[in-house]
Amino acid sequence: LVVMTADHGGAHNPNLLKKHKIPAGGWDGKGAMKKANEELAKQFGVQGNLIKDMLNNFFYLDRELIEANKLSWDDVKAAAIKELKKDPEAQYVVDMEHIATSNMPEFLRERALNAYCPGRTGEIMFITHPQVFTWRFGDDYIGTTHSAWNPYDAHIPLLFMGWKIGHGNTYQPTKIVDMAATVCALLNIQMPNACIGTAILPLLEST
């Protein structure tokens, strides 16, 4: 039995899309952070950056600076989110501690939660509009990237071949975590303790 997949897809080249009049672009995350920090410094009367850093669409607040200035963590976070939402490339700017009550669609909220690890990822997640890269690029750029929730990145191959696998395909949504559950169903054994997927029924029906 052979199972093959990929960890991500790839975005269409934004310059090519723009040539065909399809909205696309690049987001200056560091610039957005700098602008937000300038406004936060004025609002709270502090010297230094209340947003400490950004990585992979997450913004990290400076807890030490907030505590040193006796500021409210929640007030600073809310103000940072308000400033970041002013960015024209912002589709959603989310407080990860309270994402369960956000106004994001359920499927997108679930994916954002899957990317969140308290203490390691940032407190604020910035989600750009579709086909917006997370950096600026020139008119001669011909590459691509990934790390988006959109179908061009999230739609990836998943192939089962060999023992007990018949010919077929499915348009039913599946996830990488479904692989373990499906293999266990083929073997008629218990799923692993940490398995959170479900068996891919169309594949089992082809056996």
Question: Regions from the language model: what does each represent?
Answer:
Residues 101, 113-117, 124, 170-173, ...:
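Cysteine endopeptidase catalytic domains of the caspase/legumain-like
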Residues 81, 85-89, 184-192, 205:
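Sec-exported extracytoplasmic/periplasmic mature domains
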Residues 9-11, 122, 162, 188, ...:
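Glycine-centered flexibility sites
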Residues 133-137, 167-168:
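Short, solvent-exposed loop/turn elements at domain surfaces
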Residues 27-73, 143-187, 201-206:
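Substrate-binding rim/cap in mid-to-C-terminal beta-strand-loop elements of soluble/periplasmic
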Residues 109, 142, 197:
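Conserved glycosyltransferase catalytic-site signature
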Residues 137-143:
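Conserved alpha/beta core surface patches that mediate binding of polyanionic ligands
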Residues 1-132:
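Secreted, luminal/periplasmic, and some membrane-associated catalytic domains
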